[in-house]
Amino acid sequence: MLKECIKIEGRAFLGGKVTRVKLGSGECKTLQLSNKYLILPGMVDIHVHFRDWGLSHKETLRGGAAAALAGGVVAVGDMPNTKPHIRTADLYKKRLEEGSALPIIYKVHMGIPQDLEELRAARPPTIKIYPEDVEAFGWGHIEKAAEACASLGCRLVLHCEDPAYFKEGERPPIAELACVERTRQMAFKTGVKIHLTHITLSQTAEAARGWATVDATPHHLLLDVENCKDSGLCHVNPRLRTPEMRKRLLAAFASGLVDIYATDHAPHTLEEKRSGAPPPGICSLDVALSLLLTLWKRGVVTLSDVVRLYSHRPARFFDLQIDVKKGYFTVVRLEEFTVRGEEFAGTCKHTPFEGFKAFGRVFATSVGGRIYFKDGDVYMINI
């Protein structure tokens, strides 16, 4: 972090209104802002993959945190498909302890264990279910986990694709729709809270109303099989859809049917992505806020939508208080720029958004009143 504290003054936008924001004491250095800057609550990304452990060649906790700070993100929810997979209370607690050293707020979704007593020992607020878990354990075990989760007051986060519909490497849209219906029945039977992550279909957003929350990613909102044809960089699960499907999802997103915006930031090495069998995953955490602000600039969403989708609702998801006045904020310069992966702050330096004209470049990020990112530089000297 910067050694001196920072006070922000000046006419700047806060939640769509021109205002003056002061943080810090009179001795603090003052950061003067003009109307060319936007002050927003810090962003919260509930779906990231910070890898590390046996996958540190792809990404590390430190690298992931750097990408978050560069993207205006002050809190994240990390996924459990690490190496080893986080399926035990001991691994869950170990990961949380390691993440506590980061300058951002760090949460972890626990993986589903074979022995459900591990859930009672860990008492995680969220459990992540993958299609591979359905293949490994069966829907019966998933339902037992849902019952245990309901009794503990936690939430199931599902990558909702039914593997029964996977065929010859293809994952058709029907796999998502079938999983949604099966999950709906499970939710009503067990009473468990459900969140469907990285949905790709407007029908999913509509079907989830009343019993589940949903999120959508920047790549499923902006990229499709026609405008993203790089077989490596564009390879992701769930798959990118047709332009028509993408546009319908974007319309659902703009209408308020989608609760949360989340990246599914999933780094792999460029060599892996350029191989004959590229692993699925897209890097976008550094620029996800800018991509969302681009939709605001285009008139697709409002500024209130931006804050609701990427700060307020995901903060509520983790029961966090993310408030500008408490020092959790990001400062955005209102300018257009070209996305360049080589400029990313995290370990991952490649993205299918390469060359994309985005709007709103993150200038500074504060966590708890401390500036950890400013004008292209990340400050993490204490870890």
UniProtKB/Swiss-Prot annotation:
Molecular function terms, GO-annotated: allantoinase activity; dihydroorotase activity; zinc ion binding
Active site: 264
Keywords attached to this entry: Hydrolase, Metal-binding, Pyrimidine biosynthesis, Zinc
Cysteines paired by S-S bonds: none
Positions of Zn(2+) 2 binding: 128, 159, 198
GO biological process, one term: purine nucleobase catabolic process
PTM sites of type N6-carboxylysine: 128
UniProt pathway: Pyrimidine metabolism; UMP biosynthesis via de novo pathway; (S)-dihydroorotate from bicarbonate: step 3/3
Sites where the protein binds Zn(2+) 1: 47, 49, 128, 264
SUPFAM superfamilies from the UniProt entry: Composite domain of metallo-dependent hydrolases, Metallo-dependent hydrolases
Stated family: Belongs to the metallo-dependent hydrolases superfamily. DHOase family. Class I DHOase subfamily.
Protein task: Catalyzes the reversible cyclization of carbamoyl aspartate to dihydroorotate.
Name used for this protein in its record: Dihydroorotase
Species of provenance: Pyrobaculum aerophilum (strain ATCC 51768 / DSM 7523 / JCM 9630 / CIP 104966 / NBRC 100827 / IM2)
